[in-house]
UniProtKB/Swiss-Prot annotation:
It is an enzyme of class 3 (hydrolase). Residues 69-90 are annotated as: Disordered. This is Probable cysteine protease ATG4. Residues 69-78 have a biased composition (Low complexity). The keyword Membrane does not apply. One of its GO terms (molecular function) is cysteine-type endopeptidase activity.
Length: 448
């Protein structure tokens, strides 16, 4: 019975991939709407602020799609799903870079927004790296999804030379960390269009090799030691946050990590102990907030607050938040969130002793200007939200911003940590309800 279900799921997955190959819409901006679009706290105007004639044109957030025959519908109508990416992130499973070509030159989006979006580091599935040995733990096989067990049964029995089908949350977490490092070291105004090679030292940290501090291999290694995650097993937001914190503590002198564990509570005394360990010098600090904003979908009372996180100056984006898979969300317009999709396999990013030896082609594989977006109502409720606090002023601004969001707040800031020195809540709690990887086309979406 289980085999029959898997075969049926695979057939369904293949047919949907074929459909998406043909139908791969990209959002077009309504030049008359003058709605701002945001990328990690930066706002870009969509049109000059001049009076516009009365028009019935639908805005991009209302679903205008390039060359798409589907009917245009406004958010909240029954046709909204028809103009978004098909269910289960069909585009996310393609072993093709064609889905991320740069077709948005005439899509109406502000060039400055596209330059910003295209300068965000994008970590994806990689193939052909030295195999990560399979765990010898008897529980490891049962921890894998059924689809992954099926794949490994017909593949290399000794290890994983690709993270396709299980590494999407790790890649989303890598993207979040990489962009925090990028902004803290090169500044928020850095763009690939002006200095495309400046990021080499940062990209080198994420090569698919154990010698790279933030490699997939090191995420998997720490996940096995500290989080009970075996190679080939899907990570959740909490496990990903713990790996980021542990690896950064080992290797990073320029960036501190403050993680909230499995609760959305930030404590000022604990944060300042991390950011200002000597009581004087403030170090750039990445805040990682693991949260779950509903059962199987986001509770509407949290939508405005979630959207506002991407509009804050300190935003580093959101990892997770896509049913049956994980994406890296970096932008927003109204209720539509723009994301980078890690589910596009690329050849392994090689380790280079001298980062200057990375070619522009290798750097290009870590970026895209191809836009995709998702309505906030369609997001999975489990996610990892990142904020970069670079100094005291940033800290004060961020505290005020999270306090005065519209709707119900998703982050709580308190002066004192009641659990400080006493141990905190179990960090693995959120991971015990992780979302299934998008290669598991089962209707059950309870994990994360």
């Amino acid at each position: 019975m289980e085999v029959a279900l898997a075969v049926g799921a695979e057939a369904s997955r293949v047919s949907r991939r074929i459909l998406q190959k043909i139908w791969d819409p990209e959002p077009i901006n309504d030049r008359d709407s003058n709605e701002p679009v945001w990328c990690l706290g930066r706002s870009y105007k969509l049109a000059p602020e001049t009076p516009s004639p009365v028009t019935t044109a639908t805005s991009p957030v209302d679903g205008a799609i390039d060359a798409a025959p589907a009917p245009i519908a406004t958010p909240g109508t029954t046709n909204r799903q028809a103009i978004d990416t098909p269910p289960d992130s069909l585009a996310s499973s393609f072993d093709s870079s064609l889905a991320y070509d740069n077709r948005n030159q005439d899509s109406g989006w502000p060039p400055a927004f596209l330059d910003d979006f295209g300068s965000r580091i994008w970590m994806t599935y990689r193939t052909g790296f030295e195999p990560i040995p399979r765990s010898t733990d008897p529980k490891a096989a049962s921890a894998l999804s059924f689809t992954m067990r099926l794949k490994t049964s017909f593949g290399d029995q000794t290890g994983f030379s690709s993270d396709t089908g299980w590494g999407c949350m790790i890649r989303s977490g890598q993207s979040l960390l990489a962009n925090a490092l990028l902004i803290s070291q090169l500044g928020r105004d850095w763009r690939r269009t002006t200095d495309p090679g400046a990021e080499r030292n940062i990209v080198a940290l994420f090569a698919d090799d154990a010698r790279a501090p933030y490699s997939l291999q090191n995420f998997v290694k720490h996940g096995a030691i500290a989080c009970g995650k075996h190679p080939g097993e899907w990570f959740g937001p909490s496990a990903t946050a713990r790996c980021i914190q542990a690896l950064a503590d080992q290797h990073e002198s320029s960036l501190r990590i403050y993680s909230t564990g499995d609760l959305p509570d930030v404590y000022e005394d604990s944060f300042l102990a991390t950011a200002r360990p000597d009581g004087e010098t403030f170090h750039p600090t990445l805040i990682l907030v693991c949260t779950r904003l509903g059962i199987d979908k986001i509770n509407p009372v949290y939508e405005e607050a979630l959207i506002s996180t991407l509009q804050m100056e300190q935003s580093i984006g959101i990892a997770g938040g896509r049913p049956s898979s994980s994406h890296y969300f970096v932008g927003v317009q109204r209720q539509w969130l723009f994301y980078l999709d890690p589910h596009h396999p690329r050849p392994a990013l090689q380790y280079r002793e001298n980062p200057l030896n990375y070619t522009l082609e290798e750097l290009d594989s870590c970026h895209t200007r191809r836009l995709r977006y998702l309505h906030v109502e369609d997001m999975d409720p489990s996610m990892l939200i990142g904020f970069l606090i670079q100094d005291e002023d940033d800290w004060d601004m961020w505290k005020s911003a999270v306090k005065h969001v519209q709707g119900k707040s998703i982050i709580n800031v308190s002066r004192h940590d009641p659990a400080r020195g006493m141990g905190g809540a179990r960090a693995e709690a959120i991971d015990e309800v992780e979302t299934l990887s998008d290669d598991d086309d089962v209707d059950t979406v309870l994990e994360q």
